[in-house]
């Protein structure tokens, strides 16, 4: 296990970090670069109270957004607006115009964006030798 600086810990086949380990202030926190992700794009955004991003779209990359903290409004190219609270997701296809606004006048909003282009999507997870459950002895109800 090695320390990657600023609290990012990298081990053999993994990396862990807190949001603040990936940067300070408002704007982008580069999850992909900070943790060494290579299979997809990943960023966290810290959006100040009342702030709105510019509109943007992508040529190939669809994006999945997860609102971690606060309340935001997504405005799409078709003119629709959707308010999302912490714990909510939004998927946006590559060519769809989008912009995001922090609905609070006093609190930051934090959201995570995971992006990638069409390709392999499948389930290839498996249990390591000797394991019989993904949850060990602590399986949640219904798992």
Question: What is the predicted role of each segment?
Answer:
Residues 91, 106-121:
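A short hydrophobic beta-strand segment most commonly corresponding to one strand
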Residues 60-62, 66-72:
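Glycine- and acidic-residue-biased ligand/ion/polar-headgroup-sensing regions
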Residues 78-94:
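Short acidic-glycine-tyrosine-enriched beta hairpin
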Residues 101-104:
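Asparagine-centered strand-capping/turn motif at beta-strand->loop junctions
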Residues 60, 80, 96-97, 117:
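A generic "binding-loop/recognition-motif" signal
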Residues 28-30, 43-59:
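Conserved short histidine dyad/triad with adjacent acidic residue
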Residues 1-39, 54, 122-143:
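A short, N-terminal "cap"/entry segment at the start of jelly-roll beta-barrel domains
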């Amino acid at each position: 296990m090695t320390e990657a600086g600023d609290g990012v810990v990298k081990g053999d086949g993994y990396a862990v970090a807190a949001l603040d380990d990936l940067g300070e202030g408002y704007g982008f926190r580069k999850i992909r670069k900070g943790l060494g992700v290579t299979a997809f794009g990943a960023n966290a955004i810290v959006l100040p109270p009342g702030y709105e991003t510019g509109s943007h779209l992508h040529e190939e990359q669809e994006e999945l957004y997860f609102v971690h903290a606060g309340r935001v409004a997504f405005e799409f190219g078709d003119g629709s607006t959707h308010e999302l609270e912490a714990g909510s997701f939004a998927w946006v296809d590559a060519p769809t115009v989008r912009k995001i606004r922090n609905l609070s006048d006093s609190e930051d909003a934090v959201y995570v964006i995971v992006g990638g282009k069409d390709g392999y999507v499948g389930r290839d997870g498996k249990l390591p030798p000797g394991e019989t459950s993904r949850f060990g002895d602590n399986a949640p109800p219904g798992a």
